[in-house]
Amino acid sequence: AMIARDKERLKSLEDELEDSKGYSCELRNQEYLNSTIDNIIKDFGYPDVFIHNAVRGTRGNFLEFTSEELQSNFDINVIALHRIAQKVAPEMIKKGKGAIIVTGNTSAHRGKANFGGTASTKAAQKILTESFARYLNPKGIHVAYITIDAAIDLEWTRKAWPDKPDDFFIQPDDIASEVWHITHQSKS
């Protein structure tokens, strides 16, 4: 099951990924998000793995971005993570197994001048994930925050850095492979 705003993107992913289903959802709308999670549970049962890969960022110094933009970043990067984890973690706890994986980026570790609107929310996301881990790891649930310190090879990043060589960009399939590995790593 996959959640995204863009229905066309979801359809493309459904076509690419066997036995997958996409659910269009605006993560900032709590009622809509809860309904979407309920539909996923109805269609597939409770997930054994929850990967939070949603992100919203704002560029510009603190004088340039609005409080509304900052709130929107928090709603997607932090609040949606919290809401979904609250819905799926209790069943993982009952089973004594599961994984919650959160992807983030370098801004979770530092606040550059023009990334305050993103960095503050990614840092909060990282700390929230660490809190999940301290509570859930003893209950058998693996929790990890993965920092992606690279430009992901996407259409918009290629447009943003048109002069960069191919090896400047990290491949989405390579990220997915590492996420899979971390999700399934042994407890030792």
Predicted segment positions?
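A short, exposed helix-loop element centered on a Lys and neighboring polar residues
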Residues: 85-86, 130
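Catalytic loop of short-chain dehydrogenase/reductase
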Residues: 99-124, 129-130, 134-137
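Conserved NAD(P)H cofactor-binding loop of Rossmann-fold oxidoreductase domains
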Residues: 53-59
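C-terminal helical subdomain
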Residues: 138-151, 161-188
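Rossmann-fold cofactor-recognition segment
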Residues: 17-31
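Substrate-binding pocket helix/loop in short-chain dehydrogenase/reductase
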Residues: 61-62, 69-74
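Conserved glycine-rich Rossmann-like NAD(P)H-binding loop of the short-chain dehydrogenase/reductase
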Residues: 1-10
